[in-house]
C-alpha cells in the first residue's frame, strides 16, 4: 500500500527564516527547497477519453517543500491562481536564489452560453517566496497563451514561449521587479524554451514545426538566429544538461496526446558548430515532461501511455510511466522505466539529484521516486494535492 501524505496546511506555513530566502530555511532535517505545482481543476477526462471543461475558481499554485525531508515532501501554501494543463508542464519557474516564482497562465476560461471554453490568456504571475505564506506580488502581461518558460542562471532574465502568438517574451528580473522588455518573433508556434548554462544561447521547441529554434542571447537582447534543428515529431518540451554539452527534446509524436506508437527523445550536440541532432532515443509512448538531473548523469522522459484516453482504446493504460535515460558523455541510453500513476505530467529532481517527483494529473498526487546511480525506484510515497497537477518546476539550477 502506498504511503500517502495528506494535503494539509495548504495556506499557512512557518518555514521561512530571517534570511528571507525560501531555499535557505534551516530545520532539523534539512533546508527548505521549494517546488511549484500548477493545479488545474477545470479540466477532466471521462472514461470515454473525452475532455470536459468545468467551471473555474478552484485552481491553485501549490508550493511544496522538497528540501526539509525529500522523502516526505510537504505542502507549504496554495495560492488561488488560475493556471492550465493546455501547455507543457513547464509554465512556471523559480529564480536561482529561490526568492521569486513565475507562473504563466496559458488559458483563460470563458463562458460561451453553453458551458466553458478555453481562450488564450496573457498573464505571468510573480510570487514572492521569501514571505510566509508566499504571496503574489505582481502580474505581467506577455504574449497570447504563455506556456513553457525559463530563467537564466544569473537570475536576471526570463523567457516565455507564447504558443498563440508565435513569439517569445523577454522579461527582466531585478530584485522582485519583473518587467516585459522585448518580444522575439519566431513565426511558428513555440511550446517551451531553455537557456544554456552560460546564458548566451537558448533553445525553443517549435511544437507543430517538428523543429527546435536556436536563439542568441547578448545581455538582455535576445535574437532568433534563424537556424532550426529538425528533431522528432511534435517536440513539446526540452532541457539542457548542466554542463551545456547536450540538449534533449521530448518528441511527443501526436500533437500532445497518445496514439499507441513509440516516440523519441532527440539528442542535440550543443558543442558542435553549429549545434546539431546527433541521435534519437526511443523512449516509449507519448513523452511529455522531460527533466535532466542536476548531476548531468541522468534524465527522465515522462510517458503518457494513453492514460487519459478512452478505456476502450487498444493503447489505453491505467498508468503512465517514466523512462530513465543514462547520459554518458554524448551518448544517451534508455536504461529503465518506472510505472507511476494516471496522466503523469511534470518531473522535478531534487537539487542533489537523489530524488525525483512526478505529478500525476488523473490521481491528484505526486509520486516520490528515489535515485540510486543509474537506477530509479518508486518509494510508494504519494503526496496528496488539492487538485490535479498540470505542471511542476523546482528552483533554476
What are these regions (language model features)?
Residues 21-397:
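Predominantly soluble domains enriched in secretory-pathway, periplasmic, or organellar proteins
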Residues 1-10:
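Bacterial N-terminal signal peptides that target proteins for export
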